[in-house]
């Protein structure tokens, strides 16, 4: 499990660690898709992997190419449980299987916490952060899904594995 280095919160003596557990190592130079967001923010998809446990994990990097700080709170979506438990996260992401006519939401644990990157700090201009989102896997016959995160464009992704 990989995680981002701890960072100090401004005006605080505590060190807060961003949760970026993402499973296996991901090659950041692999660019499967690029989603444009608001104000110059770009999400680059590095891996979309189906595993034997019945999950699909999407791993990506979000970079602020704009000139203002990017607020990650919008990426959590508007579902009340996700927002309450995972405000600074990518918990609002979805996969859509157009053939099977089904939408898949980011998985959650029994406390409502998403199986995704949480505690994302506002991205300053030029900053980037690695993120992951884990979903229930669509049927093995589904090899392509539409992927969306609030404020980003939707894109089609091929599932490997």
Give the residues covered by each predicted segment.
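Short, well-ordered beta-strand segments enriched in hydrophobic/aromatic residues
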Residues: 56-64
